[in-house]
From Swiss-Prot:
The keyword ATP-binding applies. One of its GO terms (cellular component) is cytoplasm. This is Phosphopantetheine adenylyltransferase. Its cofactor is Mg(2+). ATP binds at S10, F11, H18, G89, L90, R91, E99, Y124, S125, Y126, L127, S128, S129, S130. It is an enzyme of class 2 (transferase). Pathway: Cofactor biosynthesis; coenzyme A biosynthesis; CoA from (R)-pantothenate: step 4/5. One of its GO terms (biological process) is coenzyme A biosynthetic process. Belongs to the bacterial CoaD family.
Amino acid sequence: MTSIAVCPGSFDPVTLGHLDIIQRGANVFDEVIVAVLHNRNKVPLFSVEERLELLKKATEHIPNVTIDSFNGLLIDYVKQKQAKAIIRGLRAVSDFEYEMQAASINKKLGPDVETFFMMTSNQYSYLSSSIVKEVAKYEADVSDIVPPVVAEALKAKFSSSPRNK
């Protein structure tokens, strides 16, 4: 039986920390579906379509990873994909409280689905998409914290709009 896991997130934009979790998940599961959330509560820098394309390019070297997007409850999406696992990265203890609540409700709504927490590698423990956007907004070099395709996209995004200094 094929083990399928879903790795959900906003990925606005995808960082090397995200890729670290995705790669490590792909080492454990037969198939990892990286699922971009349509989050109406956030105003994204990149559209869902742009994030899907950036993720496809950033993960093309990982054969057992597919990229998709979803609306609604994560657990419904996971069941639809016949996955048995959710992969979540944890940077710090501060992430754990929210992730534990989410895992608990997902377990209640989908008793057959397990949530796997992966600690972010130390070199990425400070990294978030929000920090990346803040640094990139001021046209600082982000090439050591995001995949090259994302660094190019950020540069294009911020050079085409007024700088907020």
